[in-house]
């Protein structure tokens, strides 16, 4: 729900005509758009809640991934940390000195949509041990992570290839970690509510229209 105390402000220009943006956005919402669908409760995640039971009691997790493969889950964890009773460590670069090395085993979420991200592969080879439990999230095609999952006999979750990194937080990439954090992932799927909120919808149109106006007229900060 959107708090009534939130004031939607924008940087609109009075010269902007937003009717075309409104028309295109209305058409887009009515179309069968898989990326938009991933933001709603209609999207079906490619993981089974029953299969995650063996991980639910675990308290320590590592999320190994670069860019959009980990930033969404990291944002959720940072924002809702006061509600989360588990520890999540995010390995999103090649500096791993801050990781607790004394711990004998971890539950690893290894995420790369292409399955061939070099930094992720390097960290995986440096960090994971035989006794670790691993879940790998990647596209359903021949790649390094799928081969690794077979070798480790690890759980594999296939990520839909039509959802890019910056849009992936509400797909398996962000929702699987959120589920393991003990959060209700349905609470994140608010698209259907937002598009019915006139204030949100009108401000979205206004902001997009203004952005296009400034770009077309080469007005940059």
Segments predicted by a language model, with ranges:
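Glycine-rich phosphate-binding loops that contact phosphosugars or nucleotide phosphates
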Residues: 56-199
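Extended, charge-enriched "interface" segments that sit outside catalytic cores
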Residues: 1-47, 52
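Glycine-rich phosphate/diphosphate-binding loops that line cofactor/substrate pockets in enzymes
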Residues: 48-59, 100-105, 211-219
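Acidic catalytic cores of enzymes that act on phosphate-bearing nucleotides/polynucleotides
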Residues: 41-44, 51, 183-189, 197-221
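Structured N-terminal alpha/beta-domain signature
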Residues: 12, 28-30, 35, 40, ...
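Short, structured coil/loop segments at alpha-helix boundaries
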Residues: 6-14, 18, 29, 107-110, ...
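Generic detector of well-ordered alpha-helical segments enriched in charged/polar residues
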Residues: 22, 26, 37, 49-53, ...
